[in-house]
Amino acid sequence: MICIKNGTIHTAVKKETFKGDILIQNGKILKIGTDLDGQADQVIRAEGLEVYPGFIDAHCHVGLDVFAGGPMGMEFNETNDPVTPQLSAVDGFNPFDHHLELAREGGVTCIATGPGSSNAIGGTFAAFKTVGTWTDDMVVKKAVAMKCAFGENPKRFYQNKGIASRMTNAAVIRAALRKAQIYLEKVERAQTDPAKYPAYDQKCEALLPVLRKEIPLKAHVHQANDIQTALRIAKEFDVNITLEHVTEGKLNADKLGQSGVYMAVGPFYNSSSKLEYKNVDPATAGILSK
């Protein structure tokens, strides 16, 4: 066992900190208290140091956008079809991506990673530990959300292949969800009569956890109109949704606050690369938290 001794402990549950020990066994926290070092094989002196739980990155592409990999290292954007809910982050994840080491060094111990924002519907995000060399052993949960995207990226990737406007992008998402709804209705009717089970549809099957509220839509949104469209569609189909990036969220902070929707805000370092970044503001997260 390992004991982290006399550190200032932040629990992430309470604002108050306290000085104490953390006893660890087989990589898991066994006990938090004082004078626990007598039970340990190894003692790490933490006097004067701040001790935090591992950080969780709720939205990234680590393991699928491989460090210094160039085009061949980019596994997170599928550009042959704008609707690919059947894709899984687990199948593209590279456990040897150097980004994982960088994440660990920054204190990140768990990540939600998955498809990028080229597609209207991109596939499932998964949760991974950042430690390990075998993908299946690193998986915390295989499906945590279904990626969808609004705004410039789907337009740019598919402008000559079916999506040239925000209106079309929204319509494509609606069409996929409605098709899956009809499929789900048939599946439910087949519970009492297996002969009525619909012909297998891989895309519809992948969207069933969304419609059943087992996982949320994970919506890539920057502009205020895209944020509003994402929430509109979630309401229409009665599904859960989280908002990612939310660059112009401060413009409708009151409405977003009333929505109760969870948001992952940022990043803030690329304000000049796209039109939809023009209102980027590091203060947005603080404004929304109020």
Regions found by a protein language model. Give the residues of each.
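Metal-associated gating/positioning segment near the N- to mid-region
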Residues: L49-P115
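Active-site-adjacent beta->alpha loops and helix N-cap segments on the catalytic face
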Residues: E248-Q258
